[in-house]
Amino acid sequence: MLVIALPLHFYLESIFFYTQILYRENTFVASVNFFGESLRFCGIFAIINTNFRQSEVSCMKKHPLLTAAAAAGTAVLGAAYGIYRVAFYQKPTTAVPSPADMPTREVYRKAMCPDADALARDTFTPVHITAQDGTPLAARYYHHNDGAPLAIIFHGYRGYAVRDGLGGYTLCTKLGYNVLLPDQRAHGYSGGHTITMGVKERYDARDWAVWARSHFGPEVPIFLMGVSMGAATVLLAAGLNLPDNVCGIVADCGYTSPREITRKCLPEYLPGFPLGPTYAIGRLGAILFGHFDPEDADCTDAAAHSKVPIFFVHGDADGFVPYEMGRRNYEVCRAKGKRFLTVHGAEHAVSYYHDNTAYTKECTDFLQDCLTRRHFAWPKEAPDDAR
């Protein structure tokens, strides 16, 4: 048996964190049973005997080091599960936020509410596909013009398609585009219970693009757009073999990698815990319980290998995804036609509403440039009613 020796304070902090999680979620008995079965299954504390309890006690007396290792393993697994629950687990909810649920800052809410009302009045068609790993995926399709370009807009972490994609939907609708608003896995009407920060979502984005090409034909241009984790999703998708009619990507406030954003955010969710062991345990939880590794994807690497032009947008007052991450993604990108827009003073995921004039102009120019590169003439002009 391989036993990894770690400092005592590491185990104590793990046990404390595990206890807090179980107490808060009121799942102590179920979790103890779950981890007991997991440990036995893994052979950490495996004793096969008809008189199981007596054998456990006997083993504990005869093998104190094995017992200590089992206790430490339980604590680590418990902490791993706790961090997984906090950071990556989510039950999909079909509730749709009202305009009153928009960001609390009044300056943004006033600008977003009219667009939210317009989206709520727009007619959509529900669309369902199955991801490559069998997860059911759902989306809303808004048809505006036959033969128009299609914008597929991905929302962020624990977000809503009709909220995070609101700016993109509004802009693209004014341009006459058709719009597809997918629910990311573990969100909305899509299946799954694990948010993988783009690791698996990138393949979902490709699956939606493949569906769109099959449904609308290869002659219809497709744009992949995303905000926050949605931006990371489309950036990571840029590193895949996308359909040839995907002609542009818009990444609004995307991070550099699932690993880096997880390391950045964990201290905010779990103050007082050392980052190194906390991230290591959180990564273990993602692998064991979420079946993904945060280190299996890198947005900068995907951007560097993208064959599709990318428009990067980032607010320099972003407190969630650092502005420097957006700049790094842009700097490594080698795709022709790439652009970067700094929205001064914009907080996280509100650049479109913070400076609508600049955002609308720059994004519209980028989209039109992508269409021109593909020799696709779309008659709609840039919207002139920017706020």
Regions flagged by a language model, labelled:
Residues 67-129:
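An N-terminal hydrophobic leader/cap segment in hydrolases
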Residues 308, 322-331:
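Short alpha-helix in the alpha/beta-hydrolase fold that links the catalytic acid
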Residues 157-171:
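The serine-hydrolase catalytic nucleophile loop
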Residues 346-357:
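Catalytic histidine-centered segment of alpha/beta-hydrolase-like enzymes
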Residues 305-306, 312-314, 318:
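Short beta-strand/loop motif that positions the catalytic acidic residue
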Residues 172-191:
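Conserved alpha/beta-hydrolase
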Residues 161, 187-218:
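Catalytic nucleophile-loop/oxyanion-hole region of alpha/beta-hydrolase
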Residues 236-292, 301-302:
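Hydrolase active-site cap/lid region
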